[in-house]
Amino acid sequence: MRPEVEQELAHTLLVELLAYQFASPVRWIETQDVILAEQRTERIVEIGPADTLGGMARRTLASKYEAYDAATSVQRQILCYNKDAKEIYYDVDPVEEEPEATEPAPSATPAAPAAAPAAGAPPPPPSAGPAASVEDIPVTAVDILRTLVAQKLKKSLADVPLSKAIKDLVGGKSTLQNEILGDLGKEFGSTPEKPEDVPLDELGASMQATFNGQLGKQSSSLIARMVSSKMPGGFNITSVRKYLETRWGLGSGRQDGVLLLALTMEPAARLGSEVDAKAYLDDVTNKYAASAGVNLSAPVAGGDSGGAGGGMVMDPAAIDALTKDQRALFKQQLEIIARYLKMDLRGGEKAHVISQETQKALQAQLDLWQAEHGDFYASGIEPSFDQLKARVYDSSWNWARQDALSMYYDIIFGRLQVVDREIVSQCIRIMNRSNPLLLDFMQYHIDNCPTERGETYQLAKELGQQLIENCREVLEVAPVYKDVAVPTGPQTTIDARGNISYKETPRTSARKLEHYVKHMAEGGPISEYSNRTKVQNDLKSVYKLIRKQHRLSKSSQLQFDALYKDVVHALGMNESQIIPQENGHSKKGGRSAAKRNTPTRPGKVETIPFLHLKKKTEHGWDYNKKLTGIYLNVTESAAKDGLSFQGKNVLMTGAGAGSIGAEVLQGLISGGAQVIVTTSRFSREVTEYYQAMYARYGARGSQLVVVPFNQGSKQDVEALVEYIYDTKKGLGWDLDFVVPFAAIPENGREIDSIDSKSELAHRIMLTNLLRLLGSVKTQKQAHGFETRPAQVILPLSPNHGTFGNDGLYSESKLALETLFNRWYSENWGHYLTICGAVIGWTRGTGLMSGNNMVAEGVEKLGVRTFSQQEMAFNLLGLMSPAIVNLCQLDPVFADLNGGLQFIPDLKGLMTKLRTDIMETSDVRQAVMKETAIEHNIVNGEDSGVLYKKVIAEPRANIKFEFPNLPDWEKEVKPLNENLKGMVNLDKVVVVTGFSEVGPWGNSRTRWEMESKGKFSLEGCVEMAWIMGLIKHHNGPLKGQAYSGWVDAKTGEPVDDKDVKPKYEKHILEHTGIRLIEPELFKGYDPKKKQLLQEIVIQEDLEPFEASKETAEEFKREHGDKVEIFEIPESGEYTVRLCKGATMLIPKALQFDRLVAGQVPTGWDASRYGIPDDIISQVDPVTLFVLVCTAEAMLSAGVTDPYEFYKYVHLSEVGNCIGSGIGGTHRLRGMYKDRFLDKPLQKDILQESFINTMSAWVNMLLLSSTGPIKTPVGCCATAVESVDIGYETIVEGKARVCFVGGFDDFQEEGSYEFANMKATSNAEDEFAHGRTPQEMSRPTTTTRAGFMESQGCGMQLIMTAQLALDMGVPIHGIIALTTTATDKIGRSVRSVPAPGQGVLTTARENPGKFPSPLLDIKYRRRQLDLRKKQINEWQEAELLYLQEEAEAMKAQSDETFNEAEYMQERAQHIEREAIRQEKDAQYSLGNNFWKQDSRIAPLRGAMATWGLTVDDIDVASFHGTSTVANDKNESDVICQQMKHLGRSKGNAVMGIFQKYLTGHPKGAAGAWMFNGCLQVLDSGLVPGNRNADNVDKVMEKFDYIVYPSRSIQTDGVKAFSVTSFGFGQKGAQVIGIHPKYLYATLDQAQYEAYKTKVEARQKKAYRYFHNGLINNSIFVAKSKAPYEDEQQSKVFLNPDYRVSVDKKTSELKFSTTAPEAKQSESTRQTLESLAKANATENSKIGVDVEHIDSVNIENETFVERNFTQSEQDYCRKAASPQSSFAGRWSAKEAVFKSLGVSSKGAGAALKDIEIGVDANGAPVVNLHGAAAAAAKQAGVKQVSVSISHSDSQAVAVAVSQF
């Protein structure tokens, strides 16, 4: 074959191969799957210049095959020819064998093994000599070039291929490219032209010619900086080079190569020691050797060969002998110097001996104390009282309104349907808090209750009115404790399976407390006795003594008197005599024993009540009928009418959850008492328990104070009482009651096991209880309170050792009874009165709950056990005035034992009852098991599956919901009559999407926490994904296919239902407001806040080493205060700072702002899909903004931002996102890190600008040319942004805008806010017992500054018309936005002004009568009139059009195109008519109130939608938790409402979101706005859960209610958001429910929109889930939607729109310019006019009608004006409304063309019928009067044409004569 043929064939083959290569897909994924999965290849070698495919294979293995390989024991090796040559060829360096350890060579050390090329070598042994030198080669230009590029890109050398140019490597980042080129210029002096376009290898080769082989300025500077910042102190550049030379034998050129490589492997932080530094250098050196192909040898060892530098081993003894004299000399010198300085060198040892002796003595005392008291006692007496931690609850006025509102909605939603005990109880609680504010509030809601909505509303109105009347009656009456709950009894059941269950069931015999009191008074059979029997028996003894009296001495006379007294006592039912008579000889108590001892005639039978009082007699405490009667009367009265404790001060201990004391406490605060209650377990949970109790039960005038307290501590006892009586620093109370119920259990301790806990319990229940009373007595005496003794309710017990096994419990209780005698014998009776209460069996308490199961059996014996409510009722009865008065005369002993004392051997009885129950249970369980076994044998093992209980656990269903669309008939249609067509939708601004990044993740997860206080399962899954705890896996896992969530750390599969239990604790700990986590803020720890302090050096310092450049800089700064000298060996310099030089020394300040709201730990922008190179370049807040933008669009259902350009031009998408500060991390770097000379990116300045974040949004997502406005309003930025965006859209400058705000948390801002005293001091808060989550408490009494936070919030807003056209969801209407400043600051120049300027939103000066413009019906009449005028103008213009064309034709040349002129003019007329109509809508609908001093902006904005100021249901407050802001802001809102005439009692519900999120500054208003949009959609108003006690100052703001819990309403119409920022920024936004927008449409338009929204929601749902799975919620755009050559055309033509490219399926602008829109309706109209003008003897009639002007819902109108055939035709049309309008227009046009006289505007047009011919064209048929009039006028024929546009119908009729 000839050469030329071969050459041709070769060329053809090459072309074909290349074509095949380029045309075919690469299919790397499939290729790798074949190699790795099917072939299971273990060794892969890449041949090529760089490790490209190998890197790809490694990533694939890590993501897909790592677990698979581990399970199948496959070990793979990925090698690359350019760096793994030795491994590929198995060319391993030989290793010398070490001599055996048993025969060491004394003269030589073993040679160190040769280091593997890629492994870090250990430090050399001390005796090792220098390594063999390696041939030195200087670095090349390409080495430096590649290193500088890699270092700037933060990549390894392997990731910077030499075949690529700088332009390719930077990925289009021009700033980064400029930095690299600048570095190259600094390094090499000059560079070739356009070096960025030249591949690195070629660029390096071109610069090699002029390269001198030395490191340049840039590389030297980078190396010097790396060494100084990352090497340990003292290990300088000289040390580094010396080590590389001695350890590895590298010359200066090779050293340069190693150091260049080190620049791309720089440690993350400074290395800790020289050993670490050497290990790091060894690692770098080995990698350098591998890449350079250098064989490094180990250091040469010294030995017999006497190699150069060999080491010598010396005998340690010889060294010791050699240095002995030196050490002795040093010691002598030290002693001489010590004597001179008069120092005792042994002083420390002497002091140590003395301290040891003292320590032994002290330890002996401690050991003795410990041995005597024990550990439990020692820890149990530690004081815990701290008045700083006191919680004061007294805002009953606010909770009353909250409870009333909740009750109102409970009735409306059917949760309360009948007036049961619970409703009555709620009503009583509300009545107890009755006040004028509450009455007005309730009256408004009842007066405006829409009863037409259903029965529940009617019920709410009826019950509400009754409650109002009841509240009015008790307005001046003291609050009372009145329990209306049904008394309950114990019930224990055992089911067929043997399961024991206990519950409280209503007692059938006692339906209310009145019945309960009656039963208690009646007693029972067990407490019966016969008084006649006792009298008879005693009289027998008397008679016997009388008969013997003459033989008795005087002592017998005394015995007679005693017996006589016993008879008297018997007549008074002396209990002490009854018990031995009935129970003395038998263990069986009750009726039977009594019967056996009575005669045939038992006499009168009486009973002792179950609750009774005793009186002290010589025989002890005896039942007293009179006192008992007083007590029972009191309890009966309390059950009927209640019991008041108004004005009483009470001290309670032992009132924990589930205790009797807690129930007593509820009764006291229900009755209006002021109570201080103590808790030994002070925590947030405990204070929340008491706060919830007060919010529920606290009556008017009541107060609850909760303090930490340990009754085991004497110090606490004294401090507590002092706090109560201290008028300056304490409460300043005088106690009326002391209820010391504190106790600890001692179960299981018999007499031989009295331990440390028993002693502590005895101390608590006896010793310190007496101390407590003594302290009260002391304080009363000190303050002179002798006439107001405090009643002490002593908690006595019937257990006097009866039960046993309870340590010193019974002794403690029994010893309290001594107080009955001490009251007489001691001198404190004027200050304290005693009422001992023997507390009976109370079910459910901590002490007795274990006995609940036997309570029913015990009651069957005729005694009574009590519920906690019943026992509390009994005790509260003892605190009634009547019993208090008795106590002031004598101590009172109350037996509340329920008859238990009549049961002998109670413990044995309980044991038998418990045994019987357990035996029954065991038998039934055994029977059930046997039955199951038998069933399985007979029917098979699986036969019982259908009968087993299976709990179905719900799976996570992460929804992506759009706002609920209202029902047309129920919600929209009632509004449609007034609102239809009343606004210009192009001037209405709506919110179509919103998003946020904040401490609680995103807007969805934040709303869950805000509205419900907890995360759902779905919320936990999303939060776990956000925090990087889980990730989605789709592929093989452990040898099986798996698709689902896996743990991000372990890779273990995680079922979605397990996410909440597994991760929720971690999620809650690392979200929200919490202690600052240093890892989120580059190590910032407020406990060690770094500051710099300048000092002047007093002595010359030791020299250190630096580069020449650095040394010269030191010299330049310090002058003669510094000495620098060159080191000849290395070219480095030594630097010595001399006396007088200044230094900045770091110091650590313990800063007190330790808490902040922080984004969730683990939040990572890359998880959303943002590329790593963007993350590394931009400020963190930019990432917040980018994520928010993507999520806001997704919230609007927009999955591709270029979709906007299908509907609007590029110039109509705007960005108004702003910030208070901007990129704080970059600002910090620019000012602080640059000052510290830390390495920073060169373009850091641009990343700090506030508008840079918006620029990134446009560069990566939007590619728009619309308006960009960047508000800076500090804390009000987000609302100011909404204001700017709103105005931008209304002014027509944009149709779509992104609005919102962002800000970060940074230590500098935190410090300066603290200096202003604006933020919450965490140390103070901790001292007050607050947790981080409680530190932001808006509106509370204890609010103490705002809590900083970080994040971004955003909304996507657009015109309503565009939203309807696109079919995006509408979350709300923006009705009004305003901003305002404040007054002059001359007296107090305060930048954070009080915000009163926002009052101007309500500015108006109305006349005597309201403006008619506020009446929407008036405005509709005006609009209809204006529309009629516009129609008439349009008709006239169309009629004149032919004449105008003729005139133009006469004036123009022959080229004049009449048809085109007519078309354009007709289109202009149509556009102008539409414009005029929209202007009319705008002026009479949207804008009528502007510039009118009689109408406030707020009132006008509401009236636009047919609403009033009364329809603002919710106000979201800036609410920063500062003392001034919360008060001022409430005042502003309240004044606005009052000025605008809001109805009395109509209080808005306040939302204070910052309790949860903290204050993010710029993002604050956006988060609040998002929350309000969620309120609009759900109707649920979230409460301020940290509002434990609303400040009393807020009570005067009667137009605001401050909820602390979420309230589900029946719908919210409108909301207000207020925001205030430093710099006198005040802002307010009014938002309205979107149903009012839908009411401006007709039903067909609404249904069409609804269909589009539903389709968009499905698309968004799919995109969202794909984003979670694939980390692709954010997808950056790589290019604009147009080609470069199209740019100017697209920019300059406003009609350009994108369309889907059929090849790429991308949205792009077409290469052809858009054609002018031709209106078909205009064309038809012109044709009709032309025909009419061409016809002689004719008359034209033109009519224009708005499509929605014909009311086809009015059947009378349709019947009068349309024939049946017309009606049938129109109703079958696609749009009946348009068809009817067209027919009506045609009728009007025909009438005008006839030229006959009119019968008036109300005349029917049925006689003019518009039919259709065979082709569907309209035909005129005249009937009746119309036909007669036409005939009379000489009309021969009438024709008509009808055309439609989007909004109107045009008809042209021609009558021929």
Swiss-Prot record:
Name listed for the protein in its UniProt record: Fatty acid synthase subunit alpha
Source species: Penicillium patulum (Penicillium griseofulvum)
Subunit structure: [Alpha(6)beta(6)] hexamers of two multifunctional subunits (alpha and beta).
Gene: FAS2
Ranges of residues in domain Ketosynthase family 3 (KS3): 1092-1633
Pfam families noted in UniProt: ACPS, Fas_alpha_ACP, FAS_I_H, ketoacyl-synt, Ketoacyl-synt_C
Catalysis: reaction(s): acetyl-CoA + n malonyl-CoA + 2n NADPH + 4n H(+) = a long-chain-acyl-CoA + n CoA + n CO2 + 2n NADP(+); a fatty acyl-[ACP] + malonyl-[ACP] + H(+) = a 3-oxoacyl-[ACP] + holo-[ACP] + CO2; a (3R)-hydroxyacyl-[ACP] + NADP(+) = a 3-oxoacyl-[ACP] + NADPH + H(+)
Residues bearing the modification O-(pantetheine 4'-phosphoryl)serine: S174
Key words of the record: Fatty acid biosynthesis, Fatty acid metabolism, Lipid biosynthesis, Lipid metabolism, Magnesium, Metal-binding, Multifunctional enzyme, NAD, NADP, Oxidoreductase, Phosphopantetheine, Phosphoprotein, Transferase
InterPro entries the UniProt entry points to: 4-PPantetheinyl_Trfase_dom, 4-PPantetheinyl_Trfase_dom_sf, ACPS, Acyl_Trfase/lysoPLipase, Fas_alpha_ACP, FAS_alpha_su_C, FAS_alpha_yeast, FASI_helical
Annotated stretches, region: Beta-ketoacyl reductase: 648-845
Homology family: Belongs to the thiolase-like superfamily. Fungal fatty acid synthetase subunit alpha family.
